[in-house]
Amino acid sequence: MIYLDNAATTLHKPPEVAEAVKNAILTAGNASRGAHGVSLSASRMVFETRSRLAKLFDCPRADHVVFTANSTEALNIAIYGLFSSGDHVISTDLEHNSVLRPLYDLQTRGVSVDFVPADRQGNIRYEDMETLFRPETKAVVCTHASI
């Protein structure tokens, strides 16, 4: 899964974003909410955006591209949808609550979670992570980069 979150860390939006939002508010309808022209136009725009993103990320199907309201919702959908009792997950002590809280909850449901500790500088040793892999490890859930 590839997750992109620009809104959380960008103070001011480029003028093009403001113009696109204004245009959407004034002219767009609700996608997939009707057979009238404005709704159909919005639906086409959403589908075209999904198609472009699928191509950009080499995703085989546009319907595999999902839009969510925010990072917490996206992470909850992914984490709760991926793991079940008997699975093993590796994460780190550095993760945001939107990762940690679902993982803690899943531990009460039979999912095993190991956390790689951070050193005093806030770094993890990948060698420590590698020692935690086992046959039932389903994923590593961790931040790749944070600025």
Summary of predicted features, one role per range:
Residues 1-147:
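Pyridoxal 5′-phosphate
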